[in-house]
Swiss-Prot record:
This is one of the proteins that bind and probably mediate the attachment of the 5S RNA into the large ribosomal subunit, where it forms part of the central protuberance. In the 70S ribosome it contacts protein S13 of the 30S subunit (bridge B1b), connecting the 2 subunits; this bridge is implicated in subunit movement. Contacts the P site tRNA; the 5S rRNA and some of its associated proteins might help stabilize positioning of ribosome-bound tRNAs. GO terms for biological process: translation. It comes from Pseudomonas entomophila (strain L48). It comes from the Bacteria. Transmembrane segments: none annotated. The gene is rplE. This is Large ribosomal subunit protein uL5.
Length: 179
């Protein structure tokens, strides 16, 4: 079992149950999935960009990403319907907890000028989204072998009913929010 999953079950869930005054341990908010998305606008001119992004995301997550396609044509962006414009991965269960553990313990401290995560990036339903400017903060990516610096979006979907519950859950996981 993933280290963070054990910590959640044995320490975080009972603590949150008390803190949020819940009657049943199953009511305690939990992380259900983590979605990583890489939007690749530069893929329009060069199809190799998609292959490199797929390889990077596969190294980061240990799971094969899905290529996303444009749903409709947008002349302003020079995009046609059906063209590949990004890659995404959805992590669940043990892989999700292992990724979250690596993100908090290894990757976020490697971000340049890191002052903490924005505590206001919740969506109103307890889900949290954040952006990473460079994929090189992940130790799985070799700096010498990348073709370009690419950012990615990370979304944590939770069972929390409100932003306050979601914030309490992520604080219990020791997310480094700035004040």
């Amino acid at each position: 079992m993933a280290r963070l999953k054990e910590i959640y079950r044995n320490e975080i869930a009972p603590k949150l149950k008390e803190e949020l005054k819940l009657s049943n341990v199953m009511e305690v908010p939990r992380v259900t999935k983590i979605t990583l998305n890489m939007g690749l606008g530069e893929a329009i001119g060069d199809k190799k960009v998609i292959e490199h992004a797929v390889a990077d995301l596969e190294k980061i997550t240990g799971q094969k990403p899905v290529v996303t396609f444009a749903r409709k044509s947008i002349a302003g962006f020079k995009v046609r319907e059906g063209w590949p414009i990004g890659v995404k991965v959805t992590l669940r269960r043990d892989k999700m907890y292992e990724f979250l553990d690596r993100l908090l313990a290894i990757s976020l401290p490697r971000v340049r000028d890191f002052r903490g995560l924005n505590a206001k990036s919740f969506d109103g339903r307890g889900n949290y989204s954040m952006g990473v400017k460079e994929q090189i903060i992940f130790p799985e990516i070799d700096y010498d072998k990348i073709d370009a610096l690419r950012g990615l979006d990370i979304t944590l979907t939770t069972t929390a009913r409100s932003d306050d519950e979601g914030r309490a859950l992520l604080r219990a996981f020791k997310f480094p929010f700035r004040n």
